[in-house]
Every structure is written in C-alpha cells, then in structure tokens.
Amino acid sequence: MDGGSYTSMVPVPTILDNLIHDGKIPPVVALFVGNSSPQARDNELNCSDAWGDFLAKEAVPWIGSTMNVRVNTNGVLIAGSSMGGLAAACAAYQHPETFRKVLAQSGSFYHANIDGEPEWLARQFAQSKQLPLDFYLEVGLLETSSIPSRDPSMLTSSRHLRDVLIAKGYRVDYHERFSGHEHLAWRATFGDALIELLAMRETDRRVHILSSDHQ
C-alpha cells in the first residue's frame, strides 16, 4: 500500500536489495501499489471489498504473468502503514487464500468501515474462525490522539487488535516503539519487521512493549 511512500520516504527497494544481498531474506518480487487520488485512498484503503479483490485477483496474478514468476503457494506478504496498514490486514482477512503474512506499521485500526462502529476489523477477527495468517504489528507510543475524537487512538486500537489476534490463536509479533506517526520511524524498522515476519514459526507470539505504562 502507499507505493509512492514506500519507494521514497521509506526506501523499501534499497532495503530489500540490502537484505537479499546479506542473505537475511530470500529473493523476493515486490509490487508497490498506489491510489489515484487522496479521496480514492480514503475509500479504497478503508477495508474496501473491491480493493481487496483487486489486490488478490488482479494485482498478484499480474505479477506472476508479467514477470514470469511463480507466486509462492504459501501466500504473499502484504504491507502498509497508517491506512495502508489497515488495508493490508483487511486484504488478508478478505483473501487468506492469497495473503498469509501482514506487516502493518501504525495501522489505522480504529476505523469504523460501513457500520459506523470503530475498530471494525478487530471485531471481524473476534467473530470469525482463525485464518492461516501471521502478523507483524507496530505502533508508536506517541500515537495517542483519536481521529475522530470519539474513536480509540492508533495505540489503543493496535493493542486491542493484538489482544484479539492472540486470543484467537494467531501468530503475532507486536512492537510498541518510542515514536509518532511518521515515515522516519517506519523506515527505521521496516527491514527488521520483514526479517521477523518471514522467519515467524508456529509457536511465535512475541510482544515487545517499550513503555513503562502499558496495558
């Protein structure tokens, strides 16, 4: 998600090249997906069924056919930050047959979707059977503002989603960091996040909280 940001402010192509060169991850093919306008971004990344279908049924098959590569039968890793983090987790929830690993940096998990109630995605995971998904979630300890003011903050909603996923039996690697909602923080952690998520094992449920006042 937010492909423009992940090729500039978070230099993922360079990060991937370095990790592959150093043998820290296997060779990968990366697709950077953007939205046509800010309004389209707001609509498409808010757990849109149409957007999830586009990613799973058009974008991923396009990679295989265009680049003449075989898509991993164990699933595709999907990543994003902010609304993109929400969209990544939503796409995996909608299409677990395609996406198996979710990397969400400061995900906007407070969002309500169409029912008007906040934290829509956490409620979907709580009410559904466990899916074959692994998660790397991170959020900044300074992300305590509510948007809008009546909704939980990114920090609170990330903690809630973490608790729901762990209670349902998902493999979750969760980090709280001394940072805000900013690309500088995300670029500093993306490489390690990718390494940890790709190396996740059956029994891994790791929670890393750097706050002295956490829940």
Where would I find each of the regions flagged by the language model?
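Non-catalytic cap/lid and distal C-terminal segments of serine-dependent acyl enzymes
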Residues: 1-215
